[in-house]
A protein has these predicted regions:
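N-terminal glycine-rich phosphate-binding loop for ADP-containing cofactors
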Residues: 1-190
Length: 190
């Protein structure tokens, strides 16, 4: 791994893991630019938290070499990485990235491209109910976190985790999942 300061310097990279802002247009533009400078056998991956990979990769010339690698914060500590494939992702690309993640000491899981993937889809009600508990005045954020952490065995409570992730990112992910499920009330941002 080495830093570069101009995209053209990536021309020999075999694997790109993109981690820019959760903005579909920005990701689409970046991947098109990357594809234009990379060799044909390079693998493009996105660390998106919830954006539809089919939409991100819609303009790619080589969609079979595109997939998701969703890491969790803090990345050096958290072992899980979701390996997300689309209908167009070459299975050998998916398997290569899966095995590479294992070599890095991660615990990869195969995931089909779907709203929020596994963790962010399952986590939405966790965060949303915590926010509703706070809004309803049932308890304060610190007490809620302490209950989950000290009594429930969680490493962090819901508010601590939202703070680590960033409220802006958490809200955007919740909105994307909610929109993907036709604004189903169980995913409605609060």
């Amino acid at each position: 791994i080495k830093p570069v300061y101009v995209l053209d310097e990536l021309f020999q990279a075999k694997l790109i893991i993109e981690a820019v802002i959760e903005d579909l247009k920005i990701k689409q533009e970046l991947f098109c630019r990357l594809e234009s400078v990379l060799e044909a056998d390079s693998i493009l991956s996105t660390n998106t938290s919830s954006l539809d990979l089919n939409k991100i990769g819609t303009n790619l010339k080589r969609p079979e070499r595109f997939l998701g690698m969703h890491f969790f914060n803090p990345v050096p500590v958290m072992a899980l990485v979701e390996i997300i494939h689309t209908a167009e992702t070459d299975p050998s690309v998916t398997e290569f990235v899966f095995q590479l993640a294992k070599k890095w000491g991660k615990v990869p899981v195969h995931v089909r491209n779907s709203p929020g993937f596994i963790v962010n889809r399952a986590a939405r009600p966790f965060y949303l109910e915590a926010l509703r508990i706070l809004t309803d005045g049932a308890t304060d954020a610190a007490t809620c976190d302490a209950i989950f952490r000290d009594c429930g065995g969680f490493r962090m409570g819901p508010f601590e985790l939202m703070d680590l992730i960033g409220l802006d990112v958490n809200y955007e992910v919740t909105t994307q999942v909610w929109e993907s499920f036709d604004r189903h009330p169980r995913f409605e941002p609060s």
